[in-house]
């Protein structure tokens, strides 16, 4: 009996150890019994949380699966737009296992590489459909994003409204990613037991053979808009300049008119003063006019006057008595 006791204890301990298994943190376990996933009362795969668990030795096999969010970097692939132009897009997908039983069966034993290959195929098919329905400029930009200025364009030459009109593009990049995420999430859950957490387009490139022609066309479009607004600006400048010149001419004409009126009023006032003075004392006024005539006549030493001494011009010089009286 003692000889059998020790082997029995060893067998019991071995069986106990073989029936125990530990699920690490961040993983989940499923038990495979006779090639089938062990299920619960709801006919769903029985999931073992992290910790210590027990199984039937020899009959059960434990498969641990990563329950954390995983990232799949998609390979660069070519897609054709609605303009029949090629674009090269790099993507990535974040996913996690949701239905571990379905995942195990769909991937042939829980192979992550197989899961990513199947998931990438689904993503590529949906993305190809979305890209084929849009133009390049819609694909590369987000909602109402501002596109890149052409190399030779000067944004300072555009007004704020003109620049906004010239540079705004109805970008649909975010919409594309949302559509791909929703469509892929539904089919991946159904077929693979995988929940797609996020999908992003990392990089969008143009093939070398078409990128230059696209850039030339975009530059031409932007330059055309810029020329249009510069032309409108010059027209407005000409209108403003003409209005300013008209206002200047009007102001100068009004000023000249006012000056003429003022000068005429002053001349009339002076003539009136002279007339009133003459009426008060005609002889004194005549004498004063003669003195001014003498001053102007004899102002220059080189002038020679040939006059009759008895003329009226010399009346105040010849008539001392009359001059004294004056």
Curated annotation (Swiss-Prot):
The chain crosses the membrane at residues 4-24. SMART domains: PHB. SUPFAM superfamilies: Band 7/SPFH domain. Belongs to the band 7/mec-2 family. HflC subfamily. It comes from Vibrio cholerae serotype O1 (strain ATCC 39315 / El Tor Inaba N16961). GO terms for cellular component: membrane. HflC and HflK may interact to form a multimeric complex. It comes from the Bacteria. This is Protein HflC. Keywords: Membrane, Transmembrane, Transmembrane helix. It is a single-pass membrane protein. HflC and HflK could regulate a protease. Pfam families: Band_7. It is found in: Membrane. PANTHER family: MODULATOR OF FTSH PROTEASE HFLC.
């Amino acid at each position: 009996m003692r000889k059998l006791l020790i082997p029995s204890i060893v067998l019991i301990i071995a069986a106990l150890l073989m029936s125990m298994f530990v699920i690490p943190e961040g993983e989940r376990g499923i038990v495979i019994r006779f090639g089938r996933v062990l299920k619960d009362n709801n006919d769903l795969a029985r999931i073992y949380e992290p910790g210590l668990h027990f199984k039937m030795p020899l009959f059960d096999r434990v498969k641990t699966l990563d329950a954390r969010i995983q990232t799949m970097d998609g390979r660069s692939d070519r897609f054709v737009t609605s303009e029949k132009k090629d674009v090269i897009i790099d993507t990535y997908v974040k996913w996690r296992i949701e239905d571990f039983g379905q995942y195990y069966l769909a991937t042939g034993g829980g192979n992550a590489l197989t899961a990513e290959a199947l998931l990438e195929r689904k993503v590529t098919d949906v993305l190809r459909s979305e890209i084929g329905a849009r133009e390049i400029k819609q694909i590369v930009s987000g909602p109402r994003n501002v596109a890149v200025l052409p190399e030779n364009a000067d944004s300072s030459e555009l007004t704020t409204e003109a620049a906004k009109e010239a540079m705004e593009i109805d970008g649909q990049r975010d919409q594309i990613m949302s559509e791909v995420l929703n469509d892929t999430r539904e089919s991946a859950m159904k077929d693979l037991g995988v929940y797609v957490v996020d999908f992003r387009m990392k990089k969008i490139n143009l093939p070398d053979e078409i990128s230059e022609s696209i850039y030339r066309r975009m530059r031409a479009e932007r330059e055309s808009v810029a020329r249009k607004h510069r032309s409108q600006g010059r027209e407005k400048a000409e209108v403003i300049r003409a209005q300013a010149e008209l206002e200047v001419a009007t102001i100068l004409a009004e000023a000249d008119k006012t000056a003429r009126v003022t000068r005429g009023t002053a001349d009339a006032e002076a003539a009136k003063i002279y007339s009133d003075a003459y009426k008060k004392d005609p002889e004194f006024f005549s004498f004063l006019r003669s003195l001014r005539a003498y001053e102007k006549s004899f102002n220059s030493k080189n002038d020679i006057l040939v006059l009759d001494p008895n003329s009226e011009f010399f009346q105040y010089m010849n008539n001392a008595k009359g001059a004294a009286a004056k």
